[in-house]
Amino acid sequence: MRKYEIMYIIAPNLEEAANKEIIERFNGVLTNQGAEIEKVEEMGKRRLAYEINKFREGYYVLLNVKADADAIAEFNRLIKINDNVIRVLITKDEE
């Protein structure tokens, strides 16, 4: 298993409960695929550097996980389908 850092931005027009539901759903996707979530950091609502899908701000979430490539591929596939997530970045954490 490799270490990955995942950052995604949720649309700002959702309520706090909806944000929590999205975060829990995607954490569940990773754990169901056998990944270990080391850290979840909800960075809150921040201004974007440029407009994405007509939004000027977004709700940032940062994850540090240990996972196989298959788990990351499934996470990436499902998060890109979700209309409430406006951007995602997945990087390998080289230590």
Curated annotation (Swiss-Prot):
InterPro entries recorded: Ribosomal_bS6, Ribosomal_bS6_CS, Ribosomal_bS6_sf, Ribosomal_S6_plastid/chlpt, Transl_elong_EF1B/ribsomal_bS6
Protein name as it appears in the record: Small ribosomal subunit protein bS6
Gene3D superfamilies per the UniProt record, alphabetical: 3.30.70.60
GO cellular component terms, semicolon-separated: cytoplasm; ribonucleoprotein complex; ribosome
Biological function: Binds together with bS18 to 16S ribosomal RNA.
PROSITE patterns: RIBOSOMAL_S6
Gene behind this protein: rpsF
Alphabetically ordered keywords of this record: Ribonucleoprotein, Ribosomal protein, RNA-binding, rRNA-binding
GO biological process entries: translation
One Pfam family, short name: Ribosomal_S6
GO molecular function: small ribosomal subunit rRNA binding; structural constituent of ribosome
UniProt similarity note: Belongs to the bacterial ribosomal protein bS6 family.
Lineage, opening ranks: Bacteria, Bacillati, Bacillota, Bacilli, Bacillales
Source organism per UniProt: Halalkalibacterium halodurans (strain ATCC BAA-125 / DSM 18197 / FERM 7344 / JCM 9153 / C-125) (Bacillus halodurans)
HAMAP family: Ribosomal_bS6 (MF_00360)
